Amino acid sequence: MLQIGVVSGTRAQSVGELFVSMPDSLIPILPDSTLRADLLKSPGETLTNPFGGEVKVLSETEGTLRLALDSSTELELGLLSYKKRNYICLIATSTIVPAQSVVAFYDTEWHRMQEPLLEMPDAELFLTDRESNGVKSGLAEQGHLHWVASFNKDNPELLTLRITSYDDQTAHSLRPEIREKLHPVQMRWKRGRYVLYNNQR
C-alpha cells in the first residue's frame, strides 16, 4: 500500500486522523472533531449530526474512508503520495438523481491545492460506441453532464468516473440509447495527478 506521512516527515497520519482534523468549514454538516472521532470509534453505528441527519461510516481502509453524511450526501477521502509529498483527495457526492460529485485536493494540513489534479475526460470516452454520431450528438445536446467519482475500495490511486445524467428517468426516456452505450472511465494517480488508466483513448 501507499507510504503515507505528514509533510513535515514526523509520523504517518491515517485517513481517520485526517478526517478528524478536517477543518469544520469543509464539513459543516458535521462541524465537531469530537463527533468525527466518535464516529470512527463506532464503525457500523449511526450518529446524528447537528441538523438531525444520520451519519455513518460506509467503509474504511488504510488509504480510503467513505461516509454517509445524511440520506443524500456521501463523502470520500483518499490518501495519495507523489515525490515524498502527500495529498488528500476529497470527493463529496450528492446522491439525489442525477448524482453529482465535487472533487478537491488538499495537502495533509488541509491547504487546498490550486492546480487541477483531475480533469474530466472528453464525454466520448464514456461511450462504448464512439462511432455513433447520433449518440455523440445526443451527449453534446445534453450540455452539462452530471457525473460521480469513487475510489477503488482498496486503492485510492484508482478512481472511477461515471456519467449520471441519464439516470434521471426523463432524460433516459428521451434518449434511452445513450444510457445503454455509457460505461465508466478509470483514472490512475500518476506523477501527481489523475490520468486516464491504460489505453482508454
What kind of feature is each model-predicted range?
Residues 83-93, 154-162:
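Acidic/hydrophobic-patterned starts of short beta strands in beta-sheet-rich repeat architectures
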Residues 115-191, 195-201:
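Short aromatic loop motif centered on NTY/YTY
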Residues 11-80:
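Terminal domain-start segments
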Residues 49-50, 97-99, 177-181:
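Short, solvent-exposed loop/turn segments at conserved positions within beta-propeller repeat blades
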